[in-house]
C-alpha cells in the first residue's frame, strides 16, 4: 500500500529499472514482413524467433505467442491436462486443486493458475536469492502431499536454486513450470534458464533483456505439447478445410511484425547482458 509521507520523495530524474535498447537491424525484419505482406501470425520472422528461442534455452521446441502471460497460461493448461486429463467444457484443468507458487513475483506468474481454476499456495522466499525457498517447498509438500504442480519465477533474472527446486518437484512427482520471463541468458551451473522446467516461458515485453514491445515463447522438449500449445493459440482450430473446433482455444499467436523486432534483437542478447553486468558492478563498487 502506498503511504504518502515526507520520508518518500520522488527522484528528480526517474531511474528506470529496465528500458528497451534498440539497434536498427530490427527494422530490416519488420520491413521484410511488410514487403512480403506477411503481416499476420505466420511468416519467416516467427519461424526464426522460435528457432532462436529454443537454441538459446537449450530445448527442442519453442512456440511464439502474443505474451509471456499467454505462454504461462498454456504451460499451466498443458500441465493440468497432463496431470488430471481434459476437463469438461466450462471448467479449468486445475479446478479446486492447490498449486505451489512463488510469492515474490509479478501477478502474471499466478494469474494462469487462477484462469484454470487452481488455488495458488504461496511458498516463502529465500532471503539470499529472493526466489522460492527449497526448504519452504519441502515443508509445503509435507503439509499438502497431493500437490502435483509448482510454478517457479526467476525474479529479476536470477535463477535461485532452481536445480534443487527441480529435484524436489521430481521427488514428489510434481510438474515444474519455470517462469523465465526475466531470466533469458541466465545460467545455473552452466545450464540455461528456460530448460529446467517441464514447461517454461520467456518474455519479450518492453522491460525485458531483449524486446519486441510484447510477446513471449513457450519452451518444451515434447513435440506433441508444442503442437498442442500452437493449436490452442490459434483458437484450437482443427486441421480441416472449414472452421472446425473441438476444444476451447485462444487468440494467442505472435504477429510476424512483432517477431521481426524480436528477431533483430537476438544477436544483441550477449551485449545487453554484458551491459547489465557492468551496471551491477558499478552499483556494487559504489556500495
What are these regions (language model features)?
Residues 34, 183-189, 196-287:
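Active-site region of PLP-dependent enzymes
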Residues 42-98, 112-115, 122-124, 191:
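Phosphate-binding glycine-rich loop
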Residues 103, 121-126:
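Short beta->alpha connector loops at strand-helix junctions that form conserved
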Residues 128-212, 218-219, 224:
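Active-site phosphate-binding strand-loop segment of PLP-dependent enzymes
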Amino acid at each position: 500500500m502506498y503511504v504518502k509521507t515526507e520520508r518518500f520523495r520522488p527522484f528528480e530524474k526517474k531511474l528506470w529499472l529496465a528500458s528497451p535498447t534498440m539497434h536498427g537491424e530490427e527494422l530490416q525484419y519488420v520491413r521484410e514482413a511488410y514487403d512480403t505482406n506477411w503481416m499476420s501470425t505466420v511468416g519467416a520472422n516467427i519461424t526464426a524467433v522460435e528457432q532462436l528461442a529454443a537454441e538459446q534455452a537449450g530445448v527442442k521446441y519453442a512456440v511464439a505467442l502474443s505474451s509471456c502471460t499467454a505462454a504461462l497460461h498454456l504451460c499451466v493448461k498443458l500441465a493440468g491436462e497432463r496431470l488430471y486429463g481434459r476437463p469438461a467444457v466450462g471448467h479449468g484443468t486445475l479446478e479446486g486443486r492447490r498449486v505451489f507458487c512463488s510469492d515474490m513475483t509479478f501477478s502474471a506468474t499466478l494469474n494462469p493458475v487462477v484462469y484454470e481454476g487452481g488455488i495458488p499456495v504461496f511458498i516463502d522466499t529465500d532471503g539470499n536469492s529472493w526466489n522460492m525457498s527449497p526448504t519452504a517447498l519441502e515443508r509445503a509438500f509435507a503439509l499438502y502431499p497431493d500437490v502435483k504442480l509448482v510454478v517457479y519465477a526467476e525474479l529479476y533474472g536470477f535463477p535461485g536454486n532452481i536445480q534443487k527446486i527441480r529435484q524436489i518437484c521430481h521427488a514428489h512427482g510434481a510438474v515444474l513450470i519455470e517462469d523465465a520471463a526475466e531470466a533469458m541468458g541466465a545460467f545455473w551451473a552452466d545450464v540455461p534458464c528456460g530448460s529446467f522446467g517441464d514447461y517454461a516461458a520467456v518474455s519479450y515485453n518492453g522491460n525485458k533483456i531483449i524486446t519486441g514491445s510484447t510477446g513471449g515463447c513457450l519452451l518444451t522438449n515434447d513435440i506433441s505439447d508444442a503442437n498442442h500449445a500452437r493449436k490452442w493459440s490459434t483458437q484450437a482450430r482443427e486441421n480441416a478445410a472449414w472452421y472446425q473446433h473441438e476444444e476451447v482455444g485462444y487468440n494467442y499467436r505472435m504477429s510476424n511484425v512483432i517477431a521481426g523486432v524480436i528477431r533483430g534483437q537476438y544477436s544483441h542478447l550477449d551485449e545487453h547482458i554484458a551491459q547489465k553486468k557492468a551496471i551491477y558492478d558499478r552499483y556494487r563498487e559504489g556500495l
